Amino acid sequence: MLYRLARTGFFQLDAEKAHDLAIQNFKRFTGTPIDLLYRQQLPNRPVECMGLTFKNPVGLAAGLDKNGECIDAFGAMGFGFVEVGTVTPRPQAGNDKPRLFRLVEAEGIINRMGFNNLGVDNLIENVKKSNYDGILGINIGKNKDTPIEKGAEDYLICMEKVYQYAGYIAVNISSPNTPGLRSLQYGEALDDLLSELKTKQSELEEKHGKYVPLALKIAPDLSDDEISQICESLIKNKIDGVIATNTTLDRSIVEGMKHCDEAGGLSGRPVQSRSTEVVRKLHEELGDALPIIGVGGVDSYVAAKEKMMAGAKLVQVYSGFIYKGPGLVGDIVKNL
């Protein structure tokens, strides 16, 4: 009820202004009596995945807390894990505004943010200040002005800097809002990137005395053959997990709706079915070789269960959280 009232107010604002205001309020009120409005104690539903123990299988997807400013707030809401970022080596402003749009009737969101963030060093300082005791994922990407043929360098820079602070590292090569980025999902480009990341992982494991898993985040807009090739590369390079999926460029489900023609990636309920199909295809190809984190339209216990029945070990929420609020986390966890 409280969230529905708050949402009514927030939805009167421009989508990005509402997002920024929410982040500011979470920063301001976490640790004060006001955070009782969203703090919740949930039953433990531990899941072993990528060599880590997650308190429960429901995580926050990357993109909501790009700079790691509200880790403790999201921890208080009962998430089993929190993924921050996407973060790049250098700060960047992202794409021109407006760049975030609600498709309310479809419970979807279109964004063309463009990896706006304050840079990896800023994120690390925020992580250091956090008291969160759950699994923290850090999602890394490349700067827009880094040539795609040198993209691996950006991932390696970020990986080296975040390694000791991350529970796992998510490698984002699937955002549609950085020109050329999705080309890294294919063929030799993917093999070369994963090989370099795996080599760096071994070096950093020796340096820091701990193993931090790597998970690759992929797009929903892939053919079965492309998914098969990605799976081959994941297994060949001994990557620890795969996150499926990012946002879609497909607009067929939202055709005719307000904002449907805005450029960018579509998330939320409209991508639910396709992302679940990608999870299912990945599971057919991978079996138990590496775990899948399912994301895309997880806006209810039923949607979460569908992802898990398709083969996901964990799930993440973002757009569903915007539309349903923190209660969504509890609804999923309590019903599993």
UniProtKB/Swiss-Prot annotation:
GO cellular component, one term: cytoplasm
Pathway participation: Pyrimidine metabolism; UMP biosynthesis via de novo pathway; orotate from (S)-dihydroorotate (quinone route): step 1/1
One record GO biological process: 'de novo' pyrimidine nucleobase biosynthetic process
SUPFAM superfamilies on file: FMN-linked oxidoreductases (SSF51395)
Intrachain S-S bonds: none
Location within or outside the cell: Cell membrane
CDD domains, alphabetized: DHOD_2_like
EC number: 1.3.5.2
Keyword Flavoprotein attributed: yes
An example molecular function term from Gene Ontology annotations: dihydroorotate dehydrogenase (quinone) activity
Cofactor: FMN
Function: Catalyzes the conversion of dihydroorotate to orotate with quinone as electron acceptor.
Cross-referenced NCBIfam families: PRK05286.1-1 (NF003644), PRK05286.1-2 (NF003645), PRK05286.1-4 (NF003646), PRK05286.2-5 (NF003652), pyrD_sub2 (TIGR01036)
Subunit composition and interactions: Monomer.
HAMAP family in the record: DHO_dh_type2 (MF_00225)
Protein's name in the database: Dihydroorotate dehydrogenase (quinone)
Native source species: Vibrio atlanticus (strain LGP32)
